[in-house]
Curated annotation (Swiss-Prot):
Homotetramer. The reaction produces a racemic mixture of D-glycero-alpha-D-manno-heptose 7-phosphate and D-glycero-beta-D-manno-heptose 7-phosphate. One of its GO terms (molecular function) is carbohydrate derivative binding. GO terms for biological process: carbohydrate metabolic process; D-glycero-D-manno-heptose 7-phosphate biosynthetic process. GO terms for cellular component: cytoplasm. Catalyzes the isomerization of sedoheptulose 7-phosphate in D-glycero-D-manno-heptose 7-phosphate. Its cofactor is Zn(2+). Binds 1 zinc ion per subunit. It comes from Chromohalobacter salexigens (strain ATCC BAA-138 / DSM 3043 / CIP 106854 / NCIMB 13768 / 1H11). It catalyses: 2 D-sedoheptulose 7-phosphate = D-glycero-alpha-D-manno-heptose 7-phosphate + D-glycero-beta-D-manno-heptose 7-phosphate. This is Phosphoheptose isomerase. It is found in: Cytoplasm. InterPro entries: GmhA/DiaA, Phosphoheptose_Isoase, SIS_dom, SIS_dom_sf, SIS_GmhA/DiaA_subfam.
Length: 197
């Protein structure tokens, strides 16, 4: 097997996925960034959740806001709901794994806050329940999905925003999700603190 050819194939597939996504996703990323900025200037916060690689993306996003992205600026309020193992395991043990995010949202979410809900399939049951809990708390949703949007897409209202990656490959969807997250962080900084160019 020619491993270098296989590696090149992955690079090319990633480039193709991002090129295709660049033709359809920018308007949705722009709207999502504007929603997040409105939340932040209104003294709200952004909660984020997902499973596996999407949990990592949730933490990546919140760390970029709490710390910094590519320039010095004040910390911004964001929280990944994926990091507190005592909370996650107690909810999973006492209730259900499907409730590990929704119970946190019911305690922490406030009207006007945003939930960044991440799932490559759009069908993660605990993320679906997180969206339902966020709506119950009068929060808005920014959903990062893939494939056909899954169950998450059907739960979104007119005040929510879905960034759906046009791919069926989990790896390619995750790669575009990370790029979308970086775009969101950049646009938040641009809108709140002005251009650096």
């Amino acid at each position: 097997m020619d491993f270098q050819s296989r590696i090149l194939g992955h690079f090319n597939a990633s480039i193709d996925a991002k090129t295709y996504a660049s033709e359809v996703l920018p308007p949705f990323i722009e709207v999502a960034s504007q929603m997040m900025v409105q939340c932040l200037v209104s003294e709200g916060k952004i909660l984020a959740c997902g499973n596996g690689g999407s949990a990592g993306d949730s933490q990546h996003f919140s760390s970029e806001l709490l710390n910094r992205f590519e320039r010095e600026r004040p910390s911004l309020p964001a929280l990944a709901l994926t990091t507190d193992t005592s909370t996650l395991t107690s909810i999973a043990n006492d209730y259900s794994y499907n409730e590990i995010f929704s119970k946190q949202i019911r305690a922490l979410g406030q009207p006007g806050d945003i939930l960044l809900a991440i799932s490559t399939s759009g069908n993660s049951a605990n993320v679906v329940q997180a969206i339902q809990a966020a709506h119950d708390r009068d929060m808005h949703i920014v959903a990062l999905t893939g494939r056909d949007g899954g169950d998450m897409a059907s739960l979104l209202g007119q005040d929510d925003c879905e960034i759906r990656v046009p791919s069926t490959s989990t790896a390619r969807i995750q790669e575009v999700h990370l790029l979308a997250i970086h775009c969101l962080c950049d646009l938040i900084d641009q809108q709140l603190f002005g251009s650096t160019e």
